[in-house]
Design a protein with these regions (language model features):
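Bacterial Sec-dependent N-terminal signal peptides
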Residues: 1-24
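Non-catalytic accessory regions flanking glycosidase/transglycosidase catalytic cores in CAZymes
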Residues: 21-244, 248-257, 289-293, 297-325, ...
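Histidine-centered catalytic micro-motifs
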Residues: 260
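Active-site His/acidic residue clusters
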Residues: 263-283, 329
Length: 516
């Protein structure tokens, strides 16, 4: 094991002379640094033609009475701009392997319309297609991540899509793009060759998909200086054999990344309520969510064994909580509320993701608007930002920052699952001379007194900003008419001492500190 892995993954807290004493938890941040950068893409988003994610969420059309920017909802557009979204995946999800891109180009009133059989049988009029997605990404400075159709599409269809988007040559596809109003090609880096090939993307074996991937990848060309980063449809959860087969059978042969999907679901038959849950269910969900650390380790171990040079990246391009839909909504639309519990889940996941960015290069939460663990919820002309949105915003200081390893000595809360829940968690980074420290208190009732110590005695001399996200109850959420029930506010329960930074974390809270 190399030195970096020893720092990142050590199970023993080497806290020197600092003990718990008057503190409930003690943290030591190794401020000398790791030399590892946290990719901004860890904070990626996912948008699918599912429920009201696209229509009514991102897109209302230019003729809508909802305020819009070229057809994009202005309130959602502005919220995403403030969030500094680095990358967004589209058009799915399961929808991707039913999506035929030529249905979504040309005059909107002449586009094909279909029934979205994957998600509730909703009419799909294709008014949001390639141009609308890529133009949105361009306007918001988001890197697009296209998911191609392997399940029901042909090699030719996928190859022509890449040419349509990225070629500046004199060709039928490039001329078709120009005829549809886009003269210059777009830059498209990330391209997924299929989605969930083991399930809704074709119910394939890993051996069969590996061969199919290599065939499709062969014909996805690099045009006009654009270089595709090709991504294989990877495993779900604990299917380590899928990763092993793809790494052996594809390896570096046209594969730059391999995906992984992991949802925080305990029982797929009854996923539980988003807002009405017991204390026991709260801790069980947190436990299930942080099991992702062991899942990441095991997939990465396989990749390290078969790709010791680290040429293939791991991309967690679907993750987040998944509950029963809100009562009275279409079961196929996956609309759920979003509480302070989800904010804690998001923070704990980021704390884990940061440890594994030697191999983990992207994560895309499901989904950006109105679906699953959404950033934003809309209802006709109204919009609310969820607690999860606020965690993404509070944590975006870690994008492209140097990861600082930290040891945490904390009590844990036992639950019905195999992984106990740490009462305190931490992640830290440094960028532009600033040290950014994010702290989590998972305990529902107890404020946690925490000492944050540093290897260097003069690592921190001043706290420049401090905010906290919390509420009176983990079940609290933002809703239409009470949009700011859970929102960040200034935080003052800290002080600098000779021993370090002493912080008192409120129950069920996320705290962000920036210091120098």
């Amino acid at each position: 094991m190399n030195r970096l892995n020893s720092i990142l993954l050590a199970g023993i807290c080497l806290l020197g002379p600092v003990g718990l004493s008057a503190q409930d938890a003690t943290i030591r941040i190794h401020d000398a640094g790791t030399g590892v950068t946290i990719p901004a893409e860890i904070y990626g988003q996912f948008s699918e033609h599912l429920g009201r994610c696209i229509y009514g969420g991102l897109w209302v059309g230019e003729d809508s009475d909802v305020p819009n920017v070229n057809g994009y909802r202005k309130d959602v557009f502005d919220a995403l701009k403030a969030l500094k979204v680095p990358v967004m995946r589209w058009p799915g999800g399961c929808f991707a392997d039913d999506y035929h891109w030529m249905d979504g180009i040309g005059p909107q009133e002449k586009r094909a319309y279909i029934s979205n059989t994957n998600w509730g049988g909703t009419l799909e009029d294709n008014s949001f297609g390639t141009h609308e997605f890529l133009n949105l990404c361009e306007m918001l400075d988001i890197e697009p991540y296209i998911s191609g159709n392997v399940g029901s599409g042909s090699v030719e269809e996928m190859a022509k899509w890449v040419e349509y988007m990225t070629s500046d040559a004199k060709s039928t596809m490039a001329d078709l793009r120009r005829a549809n109003g886009r003269q210059e090609p777009w830059k498209v880096k990330y391209f997924g060759i299929g989605n969930e090939a083991w399930g809704c993307g074709g119910n394939m074996t890993p051996e069969y998909y590996s061969d199919l991937y290599r065939r499709y990848a062969t014909y996805l060309r690099d045009y006009s200086g654009n270089r595709l980063y090709k991504i294989a449809s990877g495993a779900s959860d604990y299917d380590y054999n899928w990763t092993r087969v793809l790494m052996k059978n594809i390896g570096r042969k046209g594969m730059k990344g391999i995906s992984l999907h992991y949802y925080t679901v305990i029982n797929w038959r009854d996923k539980g309520a988003a807002t009405k849950f017991s204390d026991k269910e709260y801790y069980n969900i947190l436990s299930k969510s942080i099991e992702i650390e062991d899942v990441l380790k095991k997939h990465i171990d396989i990749m390290d064994e078969l790709d010791p040079q680290g040429n293939v990246d791991l991309l967690l391009d679907e993750w987040g909580t998944w509950y029963n839909v809100e009562p009275g909504t279409n079961p196929g639309h996956l609309y759920q509320q979003n509480t302070m519990r989800d904010a804690i889940v998001a923070a704990l996941n980021f704390d884990i993701f940061h440890k594994y960015t030697r191999r983990l290069k992207m994560a895309n939460i499901a989904q950006v608007v109105n679906v699953l663990q959404a950033m934003i919820l809309t209802n006709e002309r109204e919009m609310v930002l969820t607690p999860t949105y606020h965690v993404f915003e509070m944590y975006n200081v870690h994008q492209d920052a140097e990861y600082l390893a930290a040891d945490c000595l904390t009590p844990k809360t036992a639950c019905d699952r195999k992984v106990d829940v740490p009462q305190v968690d931490v992640t830290a980074s440094r960028k532009d001379g600033m040290m950014n420290i994010s702290l989590v208190n998972t305990d529902l009732k107890k404020p946690m007194k925490v000492l944050v110590a540093f290897d260097s005695p003069k690592a921190v001399s001043e706290v420049l900003s401090a905010r906290v996200l919390t509420s009176g109850d983990a079940r609290d959420y933002n809703d239409f008419g009470s949009a700011d029930k859970v929102a960040p506010v200034a935080f003052k329960a800290y002080k600098l001492t000779k021993a370090g930074l002493e912080v008192t974390l409120p129950p069920c809270s996320v705290v962000a500190l920036s210091a120098k």
